[in-house]
Amino acid sequence: KALGGRVPAFDDLPNLDYASMCFKEAMRIYPPVWMLNRTAVEEDEIGGFYVPAKTDILLLPYLTHRHPEFWEDAEEFVPERFSTENSENRPKFAYYPFGGGPRICLGNSFAMMEAQLIIAMILQRFKVKLAPEHKVEAEVSLTLRPKRGIMVSLEKV
């Protein structure tokens, strides 16, 4: 609706809030990089735990993005979680599908932009539904991916 039927362009990104929220919610539930590794460069304390220098630390976006302290009904797809009002009080690293800090994925902004435009173009033309008998299961590898793909039906709008 924000586009009036025309193909989306870069200048439309600020008006594609719902496409952005949908992509962020998909990345919350199934972050492609499900595990990140960091090494402590010096001794530190994290959450009351002593961490010696050179300790490997695993960060698990897949688990953090489902943690009930941060996400109510975490297994449900609810794009509105990422509205401005619902995001403003969320802890900084409750959501980090692209990592964070100085080692955040360089492609973060490009991926967000590309996804918003693609989602908008698809939804302009089709109503998308998950195939009724298809169950999405994650396959853990270097990245998280759908085990048997994602079967959808497309209905022209």
Set out the residue ranges of the language-model regions:
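Conserved cytochrome P450 K-helix E-x-x-R motif and the immediately C-terminal K′/meander segment
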Residues: G5-G47
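C-terminal helix/juxtamembrane-tail motif
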Residues: R145-V157
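Cytochrome P450 heme-binding "Cys pocket" and the immediately downstream C-terminal segment
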Residues: S109-L144
